[in-house]
Amino acid sequence: MKLANWYWLSSAVLATYGFLVVANNETEEIKDERAKDVCPVRLESRGKCEEAGECPYQVSLPPLTIQLPKQFSRIEEVFKEVQNLKEIVNSLKKSCQDCKLQADDNGDPGRNGLLLPSTGAPGEVGDNRVRELESEVNKLSSELKNAKEEINVLHGRLEKLNLVNMNNIENYVDSKVANLTFVVNSLDGKCSKCPSQEQIQSRPVQHLIYKDCSDYYAIGKRSSETYRVTPDPKNSSFEVYCDMETMGGGWTVLQARLDGSTNFTRTWQDYKAGFGNLRREFWLGNDKIHLLTKSKEMILRIDLEDFNGVELYALYDQFYVANEFLKYRLHVGNYNGTAGDALRFNKHYNHDLKFFTTPDKDNDRYPSGNCGLYYSSGWWFDACLSANLNGKYYHQKYRGVRNGIFWGTWPGVSEAHPGGYKSSFKEAKMMIRPKHFKP
């Protein structure tokens, strides 16, 4: 009912407003004296406004007076709200147009950087763009694959160059050592006025630095035990075991195998620093062996004994071990002795001029594996061995992999069946002393 009344009042007001407008238009050109007779229409307040801002109004149209509802004052507010909404809609339209322009700007540019007109439907343009991106990705993938192949080729060339440079360095060092050896021998032969070795050793000699066991022998030490030596003053001194009895004495022991109390399946760092008990089983250490063989020209003696009581030896008139940079490369001279030259067995098994290999560092010439890992030890392997004094210690003959202490020229070894029992050694010892030492 209220809605119907409100609708009727609104229609009456609008009709009145339209009548006023029409009346005003028709009487615009009437003279002033005729304007006096026009009926006045007034919109006036009929009371005080309430707190909510609702004010009562009435329209006077003599003889008619129409009282408007209080909500009539809200018409102006509604009108303003509609205007605001129209402005918001217009603003959103403009924003949408800007977005469309920006999206067009992000499209594919032409060769000159200008936007090209679209010749197809939006879906077709998107599909074309996807295909172009896929083509670019495939092209980049192909280029990346080619780059990886080139990197691998360069790595291979670099390794070859490093190997060539290493061989050149080794040959250079070997030639320098050989030249120095020749010079020393020449000077020793020309020194005819020098006092004899017997005269030198007959007088007590006081050494400030003992480079090896022969220096202790020279001052009268005859007891086989541990002594402290300093082969290189630039490096720290260290203890060694001296054999003062075998073949005139003065020997510095590098390695000893007696009872299997020490494990020789060790890492590169262990063989580098040394391990074991100097009075029982041990490896002196590759760094120390290098310093000892660098300070003087040394000879090498190897003593072997099997469980049958057979004792044989091998003697080499030169022995030198390079530094770690050259992977402790081995050099031995001419052979003499009773055990046979197992270090230079034949052209296929030759330990001379070979690098040191351990289970965790492969420097041997076997292309399909690590000889140190297979034979459980560190040694100057070829591909793989005709000798290995650092193999496992077996207390009797054994079968399987020949990973025990091994000397390929030992009597009876060549007759053994490959799948049969292998001989083992009771004792093995490596020791050095200066080449020109005289007891």
From Swiss-Prot:
According to the record, the residues making up region (Disordered) are 103-126
Primary localization: secreted
**Signal peptide range in chain numbering:** 1-23
Q: In which tissues is it expressed?
A: Constitutively expressed in cytotoxic T-cells.
State the InterPro entries in the record: Fibrinogen-like_C, Fibrinogen_a/b/g_C_1, Fibrinogen_a/b/g_C_dom, Fibrinogen_C-term_domain, Fibrinogen_CS
**CC terms in the record's Gene Ontology section:** collagen-containing extracellular matrix; extracellular exosome; extracellular region; extracellular space; fibrinogen complex; ficolin-1-rich granule lumen
Disulphide bonds in the chain:
213-242, 371-384
Where does this one sit in the cell?
Secreted
What is its quaternary makeup? Homotetramer; disulfide-linked.
Say what the protein does: May play a role in physiologic lymphocyte functions at mucosal sites.
What name appears for this protein in its UniProt entry? Fibroleukin
Q: Which gene encodes it?
A: FGL2
